[in-house]
Amino acid sequence: VVAFPTETFYGLAALATDYQAIDKLYQLKKRPAQKSLSILIADPAELDDWIETIPNQALHLTARFWPGPLTLVFDAATHLPTNLTADTGKIGVRISSHPVAQALVREVGAPITATSANRSKSPSCRSAGEVISQLGSDLEAILDAGLTPGGKVSTIADVTTRLPKILRIGAIAAQEVFSCWEQDA
């Protein structure tokens, strides 16, 4: 498990196809097993490999907001580890706009987890030092790119229904998501 910077806070990366690495991440964060994890991909063209279907309106959202702080929740491909999806059958996906996060995903050549680099219910970390103070030597590495901007977390929208369901308000306003979705409704 590796800590890395994003356009908001530091995140934790584990290979999204590695059941044991995902388990280690859950233990490290002390995250409840019933809370699923999101993934970062390098390119929207990779979506087909990790999800079941892409609603046309979701393509408008990816074109407008990716890379950036919008996580879209899709029906997960059946080959994904069940501990990644918390057995929900759904997976959150996004593309980070941070160059280090993008380089990490490209270098790994597969999706990585996208969860905040902190213990569950603890404040999000903006620096490598904050990550060390919360997670210490339990990490394999920290990709230190200095202070992240912080601010609002990513917005999470479930696009498996007729209209998107906003699961978490963050850097992108709900109205922006709905307006973009309705372009092709």
Give residue spans per PLM region.
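Active-site-adjacent structural elements in enzyme catalytic cores
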Residues: 1-185
